[in-house]
Amino acid sequence: LGLREKDPVFNQFAIHAWFDNFDRRSATRNPDKVDYIFIHFLPLTNTWVWQIPITETITSIGVVTQKQNYTKSGLSYDDFFWEAVKTRENLYDALKASEQVRPFKKEADYSYGMKVLCGDSFVLVGDAARFVDPIFSSGVSVALNSARIASKDIIAAVRNNDFGKASFAEYEGMIRNGIKNWYEFITLYYRLNILFTAFVQDPRYRLDVLQLLQGDVYSGERLKVLDKMHEIVATVESDPDHLWHKYLGDMQVPTAEPAF
């Protein structure tokens, strides 16, 4: 269809593999949480690691960074992965003690959008519509919710025997609003960097953040938690002596509005 556009801001790069008998206790002291999904922040700017259980013994580990970080390193994919995780000693030791059961795989240029989300006789859902970043599995949320929301317009289109673009207007409006919220949230996440952990653990904001992460972003109402995140970023940015100032990420976006 020729609708795909590369995201002008997010230029992330991921290297990942599967490991057998990785000791998940290295990520938490709580035995009830060893099989949770974990995110590990790394010292390298805008870089983090995912830890996702696949089976009882196999774990997916992936390093996500800005493409320029990898390019500047001059390292192979394998070496970059190990150099990155080496900055988290407990994670590195646990990985080295496990068995890598899949070769490293790279993912690049995966942040994109579409000029339109629907047209005569077609609707784009999930990754076919938009993908920003793998953080918090937002792509899974968009896929499930876009399919759910599209089904209403599709059923009505079949009932009315009208498959013109206008029949999918409600879907397009809701999805664009939801994607806008995800985009803004992910941008703020990278700017807050490691400070996001302090924010999400604050009881004043925790429930609102969890609702957002569960996909409650499509209603059309302004999400107050995003305004709170903006306030914190602005406060820290404006004060070079702020205790948190040196921990801010360097991803700057003039506007949180997606370009498409």
Summary of predicted features, one role per range:
Residues L1-Y92:
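Predominantly flavin-linked oxidoreductase catalytic cores and closely associated redox partners
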Residues L3, N21, R25, T87-A94, ...:
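A structural signal for alpha-helix termini and helix-coil/disorder junctions
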Residues I15-F19, W48-Q51, Y110, F122, ...:
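Tryptophan-centric aromatic hotspots in well-structured domains and transmembrane helices
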Residues D20-T28, I52, T87-R88, K96-R102, ...:
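Low-complexity, flexible helical/coil segments
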Residues D32-L42, L95-V101, E107-Y110, E170, ...:
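A general structural signal for short secondary-structure boundary/capping elements
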Residues E56-T57, T65-Q68, N90-D93, E99, ...:
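FAD-dependent flavoprotein oxygenase/oxidase catalytic domain
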Residues N69-D153, R159-E170, N177:
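FAD/FMN-dependent oxidoreductases across multiple families
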Residues K152-F260:
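C-terminal helical "tail/cap" subdomain of flavin- and related membrane-associated enzymes
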